[in-house]
């Protein structure tokens, strides 16, 4: 009960904090934030920068490896705790396994309180005692394992074999150190070995750090989390200092966005994996307001200003009354609105309704994802489809971002009113002269 109350209190405190400031990078990476400052939007934003997206890919894959290691540790810990009870219900094979585990614990090769030491994969640095070797031989015989198997006296491999046989009995999948090693090797091959081998190769990594990690994983066959700590810190610093501020300035200060270009789809040999990752965030539209929304608004605004100037000069040189010349307020309002919104990349109406355009990129082989678009626009008014397309719009769920964009929208409204008033007064108050 106390834990549930603590979680509820923590969630309430987090929601209050999110109303007072923009999120941090860590909050985005652990997926605690909402649109438009969520992890997927951050991923889409980085896809337009060569090699920057690789660091976020590495972070996500490293977190997957970390969760895999933690799950393995938790499974080992629970197995060591529950095994004495299971031993009473099973046969001789379970007895031999129980005796072997007890001997490993007594001689210090295995610590139930710290099973994470298995991740260090230290190998047979500490030799087994004759008693332990005898128990190991009995366990192999009872389990039907050849005497040549597990000859390296590797505790991690022994625990793997025990857990593997337990999983066959209870039908539950188990994580093994082979899976952990395969995951660590995959990280090295994908991000550290060579740019020719992988397009997600991490550049600008110190050679000392790179070589040390490769040697630890591929030669020493280690897979614990601490091996990647230095690279993890470098990745976080790069994302926090170079990438995240640009991301916040893009999505938290603006609610209209031009279509971005994913550089990976313009290179030779694009992989299917990357195509699948970007599916659902691709966008194909013939509307210039959807593809190039800022420049389209500015161009449309200049057109309306030109119309306003033309109407104003015609009415002046035809000596129409000042009351009639006030009609120039309409084209001047539309022109100033479009130009100000395009220059500041803040649509005033969008800010009032609390919506923003999603970051989208065009893929030359992709089509629209109708299902994703419809699910994201259920709460977006149809009237907002005039500029930019309704499918690109999504509701701003982060409270501080919504408040910030509303303030910027108010500032843009003041600029529009001021500019419109100035043009209207000038063309309405100057003396008319018929030519």
Swiss-Prot record:
Extracellular side: 319-325, 431-435
Phosphoserine: residues bearing it: 167
Transmembrane annotation, as ranges: 298-318, 326-346, 410-430
Gene3D superfamilies assigned to the protein according to its UniProt record, in alphabetical order: Regulator of G-protein Signalling 4, domain 2
A GO biological process held by the record: protein localization
Main location: membrane
Cytoplasmic side: 1-297, 347-409
Keywords assigned: Cell cycle, Cell division, Cell membrane, Membrane, Phosphoprotein, Transmembrane, Transmembrane helix
Domain RGS as annotated: residue spans: 159-248
Keyword Ubl conjugation attached: no
Compartments where located: Cell membrane; Bud neck; Bud tip
Any one GO CC term of the record: cellular bud neck
Membrane topology: Multi-pass membrane protein
Oligomeric form and interacting partners: Forms an heterodimeric complex with RAX2. Also interacts with BUD8 and BUD9.
Function: Required for the establishment of the bipolar budding pattern. Involved in selecting bud sites at both the distal and proximal poles of daughter cells as well as near previously used division sites on mother cells. The RAX1-RAX2 complex performs the asymmetric localization of the two cortical landmarks, BUD8 and BUD9, at the distal and proximal poles, respectively.
Protein name: Bud site selection protein RAX1
Gene that encodes the chain: RAX1
